Every structure is written in structure tokens, then in C-alpha cells.
Curated annotation (Swiss-Prot):
GO terms for cellular component: cytoplasm. The gene is plsX. It comes from Halothermothrix orenii (strain H 168 / OCM 544 / DSM 9562). It is found in: Cytoplasm. Transmembrane segments: none annotated. This is Phosphate acyltransferase. One of its GO terms (biological process) is fatty acid biosynthetic process.
Length: 334
């Protein structure tokens, strides 16, 4: 399996990208990596490690799409960027998946315009795993579409159900629609319209109705469906809240010598619990609905996140998620 990585994408590129890539080579013997980016910078980092050189190839890219660039303009103007060259390798069947911690909008636009949508898919969506009591809840869409229609949410549910079942290993995923109350009458025009479609669609086997924001974390459902505007707000709010809580805990244990000693005693336990809500453990989020495997990683990804993103890409390819979505979306939901 050949996976291509954007070597210049993210706040910690290329150092952490290369470190994570080399670590993945040790863990997954069935993968080969193509790394796109500025050759001298990539080679400088690769020279720090021992690795099987026959399993790594650099594809030079002279341009970088920065985080604050307009995605559409950057794609048009920067044809020799690490993102464009990487996605084109998937398009040309020279790689099976693409991973980037770079400009999310550019990666989404590249996936959509270079790879294209799957037949019958109206909008692609980002599927992000949130920590929960049952191990993880998939939220879809987490930011690809700020405006959606009920039929879009219906398709998001089908794609999320497939990913949850085949990649996350949930036997019979419970699908919930994010709203402001559990009752069917609650919500806005979008959620009310989506509820009717989800409730009637036989392709969605286990629709549990409306769910609230707290249900993402309490384990009462496995897939939470929403539009990308709401999903991204939930994502950023969760990240901010987690960071704030960690800071509060730190401040509490740093107050005096007694609290510091208490902190040292429970540090191993806290470390273990904090790892459960660390985005790095989840690696990256697939852009579902495009004609290829595209994994979007957090802009602050370190080597652990990149290694886990490679794992996500590998499993998404192995489970034939793209093929399953193509097959399921064309079935009659009546």
C-alpha cells in the first residue's frame, strides 16, 4: 500500500511529519510512503533517521499553501504545491491515500475538484472521532459544508454509518441527528427536514432520533449527524473546553507544596485519562464522499498524530470505505 503525505503541511512540518512517517514504517510493514514537499528540507529531516529507503520516495514540490491562503486561489495558482501534487498522485492511481496537516480548506477543495465526488454524492463531509464513554463517537460533518440541505445530512448519515461500522468496528452503529432537544418537533428547518429523511431511509439501520450535544460524549450513540457549521463549532468548542480544564487542573496542583505532592501521586492516572481526549490519538479525519482516500490532520499535529493518521488511512483503504459508500449510496432508501 502506497500512502502519500504532505511533508510541508502543518505548524510542525516538516520535522514532526517526517518523524511520524518514519515511526509508521516501523509499525506497518505493508506500507510505502511518498512524501511531497521541498526536497532539501525533507532530506534534511530524513537523514536524522534509519529507515528502509526502498519504502520512502520524495516527490519534489516547490510551493507551499500556507494556512491563511484562499483555498480556491491557492489550488489554481500553486500547481506545484505539496497538497496539489499529493492529491494528484491519488488521482493518477500512484498512491492509495493522501494525508495532510496543512490548509484544511485547500485539502478539501483539492479532494473535491481533483478527485471528484463519488456518483450520487451531493456534498463530501469530514468525519471526526470525538472521545466518549464507549470509546469514540463519529461526528459528521465537522466542517466541510457551512450550509447544508436535509438530503445532504441524510447522505452524511449513510457515509458515517459505513465508516463507523467498517473502520471503527461498531457492529450496529446508532445514528443520531444533532439538535436542541430529543423530541422530533425540536430543531430548525434543516434538522426537521433531515429527521424525516433519516427516519424513513431503510439504508440507515439504527436511527435513534434527535440527540443533544452532551450525547456526543456520553456514549448514547455512535454517529452524530450535523451540518459542517455546527460540527466545526462543536469541534473547536470541545478543543477549547478540554484545554481550559487541563489548565485548571494544572493550576490547582501547582498552588502549594501539598497540592504539588498530590499531583505527583495522581499524575500517572491523569496522564492516562488525558490521553483519551487527545486529538493526536485519533490521527486524522477522513473526507468522505470524494473518489479517493483523503485524511485531514490537525494543523498542530505532532509525530504521534501523523503516525496515527497513517493508520487511519491504511484502515480506510483496507476496509474499502470508498467502494462501500459508492455501493450503498446508490441503493434505494425507500
Amino acid at each position: 500500500m502506497r500512502i502519500v503525505i504532505d511533508g510541508m503541511g502543518g505548524d510542525k512540518a516538516p520535522e514532526e511529519i517526517i518523524k511520524g512517517a518514519v515511526s509508521a514504517l516501523d509499525s506497518y510493514e505493508d506500507i510505502e510512503l511518498i512524501i511531497t514537499g521541498i526536497e532539501k528540507h525533507l532530506n534534511r529531516e530524513l537523514n536524522k533517521y534509519n529507515f528502509p529507503e526502498d519504502r520512502v520516495k520524495i516527490i519534489p514540490a516547490s510551493e507551499i499553501i500556507s494556512m491563511n491562503e484562499s483555498p480556491s486561489k491557492a489550488l489554481r495558482k500553486k500547481k506545484d504545491s505539496s497538497i496539489v501534487k499529493g492529491i494528484n498522485l491519488v488521482k493518477e492511481d500512484k498512491a492509495t491515500a493522501f494525508i495532510s496537516a496543512g490548509n484544511t480548506g485547500a485539502v478539501m477543495a483539492g479532494g473535491l475538484f481533483l478527485l471528484g465526488r463519488l456518483p450520487s454524492i451531493k456534498r463530501p463531509a469530514i468525519a471526526t472521532v470525538f472521545p466518549s464513554r464507549n470509546g469514540g463517537t463519529l461526528v459528521i460533518d465537522a466542517g466541510a459544508n457551512v450550509d447544508s440541505k436535509p438530503e445532504n445530512l441524510n447522505q452524511f448519515a449513510i457515509m458515517g454509518q459505513i465508516y463507523s461500522k467498517h473502520v471503527l468496528g461498531v457492529k450496529n452503529p446508532r445514528v443520531g441527528l444533532l439538535s436542541i432537544g430529543e423530541e422530533q418537533a425540536k430543531g430548525n428547518q434543516l434538522t426537521k427536514g433531515a429527521f424525516s429523511l433519516l427516519d424513513e431511509d431503510k439504508r440507515i439501520i439504527n436511527f435513534v432520533g434527535n440527540v443533544e450535544g452532551r450525547d456526543i460524549f456520553n456514549g448514547s450513540c455512535d454517529v452524530v449527524v450535523c451540518d459542517g457549521f455546527v460540527g466545526n463549532v462543536v469541534l473547536k468548542t470541545t478543543e477549547g473546553a478540554a484545554s481550559y480544564i487541563f489548565d485548571l487542573i494544572k493550576d490547582t496542583f501547582n498552588k502549594n507544596i501539598l497540592t504539588k505532592l498530590s499531583g505527583l501521586m495522581i499524575k500517572p492516572f491523569l496522564k492516562k485519562q488525558m490521553a483519551l481526549v487527545d486529538y493526536r490519538q485519533y490521527g486524522g479525519a477522513p473526507l468522505l464522499g470524494v473518489n479517493g482516500v483523503v485524511i485531514i490532520s490537525h494543523g498542530s499535529s505532532n509525530s504521534t498524530a501523523i503516525k496515527n493518521a497513517i493508520k487511519v488511512a491504511k484502515e480506510t483503504v483496507n476496509k474499502n470505505v470508498v467502494g462501500l459508500i459508492k455501493q450503498e449510496i446508490n441503493k434505494d432508501g425507500e
